[in-house]
Structure formats: C-alpha cells, structure tokens
Curated annotation (Swiss-Prot):
This is Protease HtpX homolog. GO terms for molecular function: metalloendopeptidase activity; zinc ion binding. It is an enzyme of class 3 (hydrolase). Its cofactor is Zn(2+). It comes from Variovorax paradoxus (strain S110). Its EC number is 3.4.24.-. Coiled coil: none annotated. Zn(2+) binds at residues 144, 148, 224. The active site is at residue 145. The chain crosses the membrane at residues 4-24, 39-59, 159-179, 199-219. Binds 1 zinc ion per subunit. One of its GO terms (biological process) is proteolysis. It is found in: Cell inner membrane.
Length: 290
C-alpha cells in the first residue's frame, strides 16, 4: 500500500515547480537583499503554500481519471452500471449535492471520490469491490464516498495542506537564512543568498514536508470517521457500513494513486502517514455511535 496520499505528492510537485520558477525570477535574492524581509517572505509563503494546494485540488479530477484509467459511465450499458449510477444519484439527492460523475476502474477492492466542488465531483468504484461485496455493502461504500463530497473533505484537506505548505516554505527559508548568515559571518563582499541558504532550504523543504504530511494524514483519518458516519446516515442504518469495513479487512487492499488515496475507502497501513484509521477502529466508532 502506498503510504502518502497522492494529493500530497501532487501538491509537493506543484510547490517544487513554483519554487524553481520563483528562484529563476530572483525571488530569493529579493527576499534577502537587505536582510530577511519577513513580511515579504510570509506573502511569498502564502502564495506558494496555497497556490500548490489549490492547483492540486483543481486538477484532482482529471488526474484521477488519468491515473486510474477510469471507465466513465455516461450511459449505463448493463444492469450493474445502471444500479451504480442510480445509487450515486439517490445518495447525492439525499445529501443535497449535484450528481457526481461516475466511473469504474480495474483493481482490487477500493473506491474513491474527488473533485474541487461539491456539485462537480466524481465517484469511482473498482471491479474488485463489485465482485467481492454484496450490493448492500457496495451501497454503503458509495455512501461513504458521497459523504466525503457532502462534507467538503477535498476543500478542507486543501486548506489544511495550504497552511502546512505555508509553514514549510516560511520556516525553511528563515532557518536557511540563519544557516547561511552563520556560514558567511565576517564576509562582507558577498551579497544575496549563498550556497548555505539554498542547500539548507532544499533539505528543510523535504524534512519539514514529511512532518507536514504527518499532520495532514492525521486530519485525513478524522475525516474518514465522519464519512463512515455519513454513509450510515444516508442508508438509515450503520450495519451495512460495518459489514463493508469488515469485509474490506479480510480482502487484499486495493491500491489507489496517491492523488486520490485520501478520499478512498481504504488507505495505507503506516501509522504516522496513514490516510485512513485501522479498520477495527472505524468499526468500533460506528458501533459506539448513537
């Protein structure tokens, strides 16, 4: 199972590209021309941080279609496809959101939802899910994904990622400037950032980026509990979602691209970077829910 959600990696790549462009345009030299300009740096960090997260959100749906080789169900060609579309429509109406696009992808049991807006989203299920679960269990999984959309989880995770990106960009450059100043103490001939600044910033971007990913993953796990409860509410009972989770716990875990893993029904097994709580914790939370 891949350990870090696709959204985080897509976001990191976008931020990295923005950082390279900013360096080529001389932003780093501007920020350190007369000492470190913290106000300008904060503005730069906000643009970089939220810019990367928002771009990642906006491209999440086309990226999901491309990376999963999704078969879109525009006009159902079989009773199963008609049932899937009908189930998504039923839950979307119940949740008060626009009808999502619906797709099927090849793979082990899994499903995901994505999209930048509640009324322009996507719900997809795998062939493995359809083959290994009862219709009631698949219905519960679809309800879970629709709940993600209705709860605005993609936007919420984007805002959290944006805050963490801003923290990483700002702090890495403050520390990088301090390291560079220490290494070049007594050298009055050089101006602008030196090699110490660039090396420190790159290393800290990576290290702090992983620390930020842990925080983002924690928030993602909390959203999973809400989506499970949302599925139970949409179905009017919690047993189908509990049955679906129990069955998922006994099946091979289907991998999703990192960009949509956070909005899937199952996620990575790593503790700190896991985007989903352990199956047994999710079942217990549903059992204890009123």
């Amino acid at each position: 199972m891949k350990r870090i959600l696709l959204f985080v990696l897509t976001n990191v790549m976008v931020v990295a590209v923005l950082g390279i462009v900013a360096s080529l345009l001389g932003v780093n030299r501007f920020l350190t021309a007369n000492g470190l300009n913290l106000t300008a740096l904060l503005g730069f960090a906000l643009v970089m941080g939220f810019g990367g997260a928002i771009i990642s959100l906006l491209i999440s749906k086309p990226m999901a279609k491309w990376t999963t080789k999704l078969h879109m169900i525009d006009n159902p060609q079989s009773p199963d496809e008609a049932w899937i579309v009908g189930t998504v429509r039923k839950f979307a109406d119940k949740a008060g959101i626009g009808m999502p696009e619906v797709g099927i992808f090849e793979g082990e049991p899994n499903a995901f939802a994505t999209g930048a807006f509640k009324n322009s989203s996507l719900v997809a299920v795998s062939t493995g899910l359809l083959q290994n679960m009862t219709r009631e269990e698949v219905e519960a999984v679809i309800g879970h994904e629709v709940a993600h959309i209705a709860n605005g989880d993609m936007v919420t995770m984007t805002l959290i990622q944006g805050v963490m990106n801003t923290f990483v960009v700002f702090l890495s450059r403050v520390i990088g400037y301090a390291v560079d100043s220490f290494l070049r103490r007594g050298d009055d001939r050089s101006s602008g950032p030196g090699i110490g600044y660039y090396v420190s910033t790159i290393v800290l971007d990576i290290v702090l980026g992983f620390a930020a990913a842990i925080v983002v993953a924690w928030f993602s796990r909390q959203r999973e509990f809400r989506a499970d409860a949302g599925s139970a509410a949409l179905m009017g009972q919690k047993q189908p979602m509990m049955n679906a989770l129990a069955r998922l716990g006994g099946l091979p875990a289907g991998e999703l691209p990192k960009a949509v893993e956070a909005m899937g029904i199952t996620g990575s097994i790593g503790k700190l970077f896991a985007t989903h709580p352990p199956i047994e914790e999710r079942i217990a939370a549903l059992q204890n829910a009123r």
